[in-house]
UniProtKB/Swiss-Prot annotation:
Stretches assigned to coiled coil: 216-245
GO biological process entries: chromatin remodeling; DNA methylation-dependent constitutive heterochromatin formation; embryonic organ development; in utero embryonic development; negative regulation of DNA-templated transcription; negative regulation of transcription by RNA polymerase II; positive regulation of DNA-templated transcription; regulation of cell fate specification
Name of protein: Methyl-CpG-binding domain protein 3
Gene designation per UniProt: MBD3
Cross-link position per record: Glycyl lysine isopeptide (Lys-Gly) (interchain with G-Cter in SUMO2): 73, 90, 92
One Pfam family hit: MBDa
Source organism (scientific name): Homo sapiens (Human)
Amino acid sequence: MERKRWECPALPQGWEREEVPRRSGLSAGHRDVFYYSPSGKKFRSKPQLARYLGGSMDLSTFDFRTGKMLMSKMNKSRQRVRYDSSNQVKGKPDLNTALPVRQTASIFKQPVTKITNHPSNKVKSDPQKAVDQPRQLFWEKKLSGLNAFDIAEELVKTMDLPKGLQGVGPGCTDETLLSAIASALHTSTMPITGQLSAAVEKNPGVWLNTTQPLCKAFMVTDEDIRKQEELVQQVRKRLEEALMADMLAHVEELARDGEAPLDKACAEDDDEEDEEEEEEEPDPDPEMEHV
């Protein structure tokens, strides 16, 4: 096997580099690189070389395969050192807006008085405040086609929306509108007014108000409130009747289950009372019987 050694100029004087080609196997043609110290010690990897040299030489930019120093890494290292030195002079900016606490030996925290030339300045936005994640336009359309089932695995009939509620946007159906309004009621704290801008019908992608559901602007009248109150009263009445019927059925079931044990207990009590009366009855006087 052919072995050749060359002096490595990137390492201290006396170090040699050797390349050994592989003759067989899947990695035939691949060359293994070894380094030899002036004393003849063999090194097979860069970590071994770094451990042997220690702090006498910086091998962070040394390429073990080629035996050369990489200039690109050397430039980056120099820039990093220059940047660190400049940062030490200028100092790092303090992004914390909280008032500092005086470092004293007292067990109580003593705040530092803040003095400013512009006391009227106020922070318009707080970056630490949680911000709602952005959503896609017409994201409510993802809710279309979803159905609800009751405990008996039967399809729940969807409710009918009032005639005053009309959808807006491309492909907005009644199901999409119902899902959008229900989602807005549960996730938004703002009043639901619909899309107030008339230009939204011409170009919904530009003039759409993302804080409102996909419906046109609507007004709630006194007649709508009265109808809603009537519906609520009807639902409450049906609920009351259902609860009353369930309670009566429960009472009848308890009475039916308790009739047989109750009759048996009453019969046992009567037998005990008869036995006690027979025991308490006095014996007849023999003189009275003779008379």
